[in-house]
Design a protein with these regions (language model features):
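Conserved donor-binding/catalytic core segment of Leloir-type glycosyltransferases
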Residues: 183-210
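Conserved acidic donor-binding segment of nucleotide-sugar-dependent glycosyltransferases
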Residues: 303-319, 327-332
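Aromatic "clamp/platform" in nucleotide-sugar-dependent glycosyltransferases that forms part
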Residues: 252, 271
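N-terminal strand-loop element at the rim of the active site
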Residues: 11, 17-61, 161
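Membrane-proximal helix-turn-helix segments that form the acceptor-binding/catalytic region
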Residues: 73-76, 129-150
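Active-site proximal beta-strand in glycosyltransferases
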Residues: 85-87, 100-121, 131, 152
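A short, well-ordered alpha-helix in the C-terminal region of glycosyltransferases
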Residues: 320, 327, 334-348, 357-360
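Carbohydrate-associated surface elements
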Residues: 157, 175
Length: 370
């Protein structure tokens, strides 16, 4: 998220906007990405990281105190700055920003999706408690978002899923996170997955699919890059499926671009996403992708492309996923056609396409207020 916010702030500053970034837990650390010298960086010194989490009671009491301090300091600073527009990135200030009396237009941008907020479709009908919590999360998000002048979502699919429960929605995609002059040759008999080893990334599903296809394609291999609490479970699953010789788990690497370039197909079996950077990176490097129809991102990236650059299959249909994957494994010409289309599709997410939409939104909101 910091990369996206930095790119947006630098672009707007270049257009002549007066831009401020307000943080809560900076604690003297310099920004990771370079900011335009005209941008004001202000830390409110709330320090949510200091909340005592040793028990639920201490956590909730501490969080309430910190949020009260956050609200007081933020309102004071916004009145001092007298801004035209204030944006919430959807964290602690999301619940109270619209109620601050500083005179600015309030916007919220969601870096998640309906699928992340409303997870009931993953729970069995008999799991009443979790389904009830899911319904409450959906209601709470929609109620809070409706208090903003505009909610910016990452995908058209997400906007359709929320429907009329959210007022004044704009869709602005994430920026392409990388830039490369090179593209993959797609000659290597190698698939790649890049994800945290966490339940929502559903790498167990990736391994199940791989076990199906590697029987008839023993000369192919799968390399998975990431880390997380499910590492040992995934290792055990690989052994149980008998795929250790064709599949490996790797720690995250700073040279991930090189790993994409030496691969031929990206696999994604996530349960939920916002707009996955991994999928955008694959587009830039010319990799065709096979994805489940998770909420959200795969449909906006792959199905809205001018030319097919991958496959999106029904969520959880391992046979359909394996069939599409084998189609790409067998047909080098198809891989390369889709790879070329992916590279062309990448331009939809370039800064010169995405960032002007923010400028247009701000101008529209300010003019409508006058």
């Amino acid at each position: 998220m910091e990369r996206v916010i930095t790119a947006k702030a630098n672009y707007l500053a270049g257009l002549g906007y007066e831009v401020f970034i307000l943080t809560t837990d900076q604690q003297g650390r310099a920004p990771f990405f370079a900011l335009d010298s005209s941008i004001g960086l202000i830390d409110l010194d709330v320090n949510y990281d200091a909340v005592d989490t040793s028990s639920r009671l201490r956590k909730y009491v501490g969080l309430a105190k910190h949020k009260r301090l956050h609200r007081e300091r933020l309102e004071r600073k916004l009145k001092e700055l007298a801004l035209d527009i204030t944006i919430s990135t959807g964290y602690q200030d999301f619940s109270f920003l619209p109620s601050l009396k500083d005179g600015s237009i309030k916007i919220t941008e969601s870096h998640g999706s309906w699928g992340k907020t409303v997870s009931e479709y993953r729970f069995p009908q008999t799991d009443y408690v979790r389904r009830l919590i899911s319904k409450w999360d959906e209601y709470a998000f929609a109620r809070r978002a409706s208090r903003y002048a505009c909610t910016v979502l990452l995908t058209h699919e997400d906007a359709e899923l929320w429907g009329d429960r959210l007022a004044h929605v704009e869709v602005i995609h994430n920026l392409m996170p990388i830039s490369s002059e090179q593209v993959a040759t797609l000659d290597a008999k190698r698939c790649i997955a890049v994800a945290r080893f966490a339940h929502e990334k559903n790498l167990r599903g990736t391994l199940d699919v791989w076990a199906k296809v590697v029987r008839t394609h023993p000369d192919w291999r799968l390399d998975i890059y990431g880390e997380g609490y499910l590492h040992d479970q995934l290792v055990r699953q690989m052994k149980e499926l008998g795929i250790e010789s064709s599949c490996a788990l790797h720690k995250p690497t700073a040279e991930i671009t090189s790993e994409y370039l030496s691969s031929s197909i990206l696999l994604m079996t996530s349960q939920t996403e916002g707009l996955p950077m991994v999928l955008l990176e694959a587009q830039e490097l010319g990799l065709p992708s096979v994805c489940y129809a998770f909420h959200c991102g795969a449909k906006d990236v792959l199905l809205e492309a001018a030319t097919p650059c991958g496959f999106v299959v029904p969520y959880g249909d391992e046979d359909a996923f394996a069939e599409r994957l084998e189609e790409l494994m067998r047909d080098a010409d198809l891989r390369k056609r889709m790879g070329q289309a992916a590279r062309q599709n990448a331009s939809r997410f370039y800064a010169d396409v995405v960032l002007p939409k923010w400028d247009a939104l701000f101008r529209s909101l300010v003019s409508s207020k006058k």
